[in-house]
UniProtKB/Swiss-Prot annotation:
CDD domains: CYCLIN_TFIIB_archaea_like_rpt1
Zinc finger (TFIIB-type): 21-51
Gene encoding the protein: tfbF
Species this chain originates from: Halobacterium salinarum (strain ATCC 700922 / JCM 11081 / NRC-1) (Halobacterium halobium)
Sequence repeat positions: 137-220, 231-312
Summary of the function given for this chain in its UniProt record: Stabilizes TBP binding to an archaeal box-A promoter. Also responsible for recruiting RNA polymerase II to the pre-initiation complex (DNA-TBP-TFIIB).
Name of the protein described by the UniProt record: Transcription initiation factor IIB 6
Metal-binding keyword on record: yes
Record bears the keyword Transcription regulation: yes
Entry's Gene Ontology molecular function annotations: DNA-binding transcription factor activity; TBP-class protein binding; zinc ion binding
Transmembrane segments: none
Region (Disordered): 1-33, 59-89
Keywords: Metal-binding, Repeat, Transcription, Transcription regulation, Zinc, Zinc-finger
Basic and acidic residues bias: start-end ranges: 1-16, 59-74
Recorded GO CC terms: transcription preinitiation complex
Amino acid sequence: MTDARMRSREQERTDETESESTDGCPECGGLVVNDEEHGESVCADCGLVVEEDGIDRGPEWRAFDSKEKDEKSRVGAPTTNTMHDKGLSTNIDWRDKDAYGNSLSSNQRQKMQRLRKWNERFRTRDAKERNLKQALGEIDRMASALGLPDNVRETASVIYRRALEDDLLPGRSIEGVATSCVYAAARQAGVPRSLDEIADVSRVEKAEIARTYRYVVRELGLEVAPADPESYVPRFASDLGLSDEASHRARELLKTAKDKGVHSGKSPVGLAAAAVYAAALLTNEKTTQAKVSEVADISEVTIRNRYHELLEAEDTIPV
């Protein structure tokens, strides 16, 4: 028997089987129902298992409510607070190409340009939406410049939304409130940035940032713990190219200083910078006060003063 005939007969058998499962039970002709829990197709009349070990084509995860289902679903882009419309609106591509990558004609390009314009108008229909769009754009820009992770951007966006809902913006600039939200979110996430670093990437003055930050924290009741000098150490050590040993030694110095009350009333950035400089000397790694000053964005005088205070708390630091 040729291969062609064998394939033909196998195809006929397959078609017959599919026809039987579609038409009904092969024994009694009753209705066949699918038992998804057990992966079986069963006759509702006689109980014959027509098919078993069926393939579950549903998701591999489980959800117990609609909110959890939406969070786990991978259909469509996830919602995010970093966009003024939470990512729910439609975006029209600016590349002027069709689905196959071909360039659009002149008439089609003009049509798409008009559609984009109207789409953008509908996305920001009122002043509140325009305010939110501008602020979230500022938050994203500053977070990128500061190298902050996505969770900080999300938290900063939520804080700004709360400030907008509670009507805290009158009398204050959008940039000022947005900057204070980034500063607060970074501290809450344990990846703080100094006021000087924040001011370097912001469009408002340092004094306004500090003033607005205190106002937002007070009015919204945000829980922001005092900045820990140890949280600055990994970033400073990484930027200076120091080893893990030096980073660990710097944290030990700060813990000793904290136990002896050196932290009180001192800038956490200055203490962290001095500890990193001292740790580099202890581990025989080359660095200078000027390099540490540049990385930490703090004066060499402050580093020297904090260094000598750490020297009093830790007798092993070389002078």
